[in-house]
């Protein structure tokens, strides 16, 4: 669903780097894909694609399946990875990432 937002070689490198359990690092992942240099509107579009239920937020289950949006064969994030990902971006502490929070997280 999100593979079209980045170069195939960059995606392969990013997915390979987080193949092992508990190896996902959102900063490294987004940097490898070049998301940090994209316009905020483009980043929000990516988050809207990740927002499977169109709630305007990325909830825990959507974050857990984050990598599968880039490659269906990718593993789900572990509970620890999901929790760290959420904690890093959840500025208002509501237990979800809003699209604005996601955009800020990607740009870190």
Curated annotation (Swiss-Prot):
UniProt KW Acetylation keyword: yes
**Molecular function terms from GO:** calcium ion binding
Q: Name one GO cellular component term.
A: sarcoplasm
Positions carrying N-acetylalanine:
1
Residue span, EF-hand domain:
38-73, 77-108
> What's the protein name?
Parvalbumin beta 1
Which InterPro entries does the record match to this protein?
EF-hand-dom_pair, EF_Hand_1_Ca_BS, EF_hand_dom, Parvalbumin
The organism that produces this protein has a lineage beginning with: Eukaryota, Metazoa, Chordata, Craniata, Vertebrata
PROSITE patterns per the record? EF_HAND_1 (PS00018), EF_HAND_2 (PS50222)
Q: Which family does it belong to?
A: Belongs to the parvalbumin family.
The positions annotated for binding Ca(2+) 2 are 90, 92, 94, 96, 101
Residues annotated as binding Ca(2+) 1 are 51, 53, 55, 57, 59, 62
The record's function comment reads: In muscle, parvalbumin is thought to be involved in relaxation after contraction. It binds two calcium ions.
Swiss-Prot/TrEMBL keywords: Acetylation, Allergen, Calcium, Metal-binding, Muscle protein, Repeat
According to its UniProt entry, this protein's organism is Oncorhynchus mykiss (Rainbow trout)
């Amino acid at each position: 669903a999100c593979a079209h937002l980045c170069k195939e070689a960059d995606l392969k490198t990013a997915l390979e780097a987080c193949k092992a359990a508990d190896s996902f690092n959102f900063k490294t992942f987004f940097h490898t894909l070049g998301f940090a240099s994209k316009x905020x509107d483009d980043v929000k579009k990516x988050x809207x694609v990740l927002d499977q239920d169109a709630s305007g937020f990325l909830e825990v289950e959507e974050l857990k399946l984050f990598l599968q949006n880039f490659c269906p064969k990718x593993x789900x994030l572990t509970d620890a990875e999901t929790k760290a990902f959420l904690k890093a971006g959840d500025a208002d502490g509501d237990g979800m990432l809003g699209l604005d929070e996601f955009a800020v997280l990607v740009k870190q």
